[in-house]
Amino acid sequence: MLSDAQISRLLDVANAACHGGNVVDARAVYAGVLALRPGFAPALMGKAMSHIVVDDFDEAERILKDEVLAAMPEDEDARTLLGLCYTLAKRRDEAEAVLDPLATGEGPRAELASGLLEKLRQEP
């Protein structure tokens, strides 16, 4: 069994791979972590991001809604990522519905939500 620190390092590697364009390897690591810890939200959100970066917004939405938010509806990180997904997919109404409540808070999530809303509202 892997320790929490080892799992965290694996997710760091997967996230770096995903952001570097190596989506296939990133997904393999996410799958490995999920095999050890089914339903583990950080791995599921990484997996969703691996779909967002290749414009597979429908699968990212499915993962976030059906696997993360179904288990933890108040997870603000997952909701923020869903808002990003909707923004990039140009689904303005859905993005605003998700991001508006998040933008009223404080901290990095609120700043990201506010920035995404500003971007949405500047587009025709």
Please report, for each region that a protein language model flagged, where it lies by residue.
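Alpha-helical segment of the N-proximal tetratricopeptide repeat
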Residues: 4-29
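Residue-level recognition of tetratricopeptide repeat
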Residues: 6, 40, 75, 109-110
